[in-house]
Amino acid sequence: MKRPNIIVYFSDQQRWDTLGCYGQPLSVSPNLDRLAKEGVKFENAFTCQPVCGPARSCLQSGKYATQVNCHRNALALPQDIKTLADYFHESGYETAYVGKWHLASNRSSYTAPFDEENYETRAIPPERRGGYRDYWMAADVLEATSHGYDGYVFDREGKKCEFIGYRADSINNYAINYLHQYDGEKPFFLFISQIEPHHQNDHGRFEAPDGAREKFTGYELPADIPVDKGDWKEHYPDYLGQCHSLDENVGRLVDTLKARGLWANTILLYTS
């Protein structure tokens, strides 16, 4: 039996109720809704950590963040920790990573200045890539190297690669580029790590594609958001627009897999 290709599509700070398959009334996620209908929809899924770096350390290592010393941001995943990529590599898979990593840099406290182990805006050396060997288009802290319509990641050789167009589209394009160059000799494990719909730290807002605000103004407010507090009225349409962009990009990725004859033997997992 031919071993399947595996793709993990990972979004950042995406609520479960942004998807139609979980009750979102607006047309935010038609592609993901179709995948949920045709495949498996998880009804109970939990993250061990609510913060970027720690949550990623759990997912990559299969261990609690406290076990791998990644209990807060700005703590690098130890190089002796065996990861998903290591296990897939040992099993004869190509390993590929695209997008936000957030597991390479170290500092003594979250508010302290970085020492020489700062890769927030620099290329991540191979030994800090968590075992991803064959294809790499990533930045450690994508918030620090990008905005909605500008930014960059680094390739396998450490060369800076500038975005063209909207950020989520660019990240997805790097994944599609990998699929186009894939030779089929080995099965692949591809991890796509988007930053959307994470807020833009240095701008204090959610940076959606152009036109998203107008498209998603007729939303229903989730019950857990206080009606009389916060700035959700200003930001929620853009937040949904970012989620919709991810859905469109998942659709483009699936179309590429089908065009290349890879879809029937590929498992795609979407989570946040």
Regions found by a protein language model. Give the residues of each.
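Formylglycine-dependent sulfatase
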Residues: 1-272
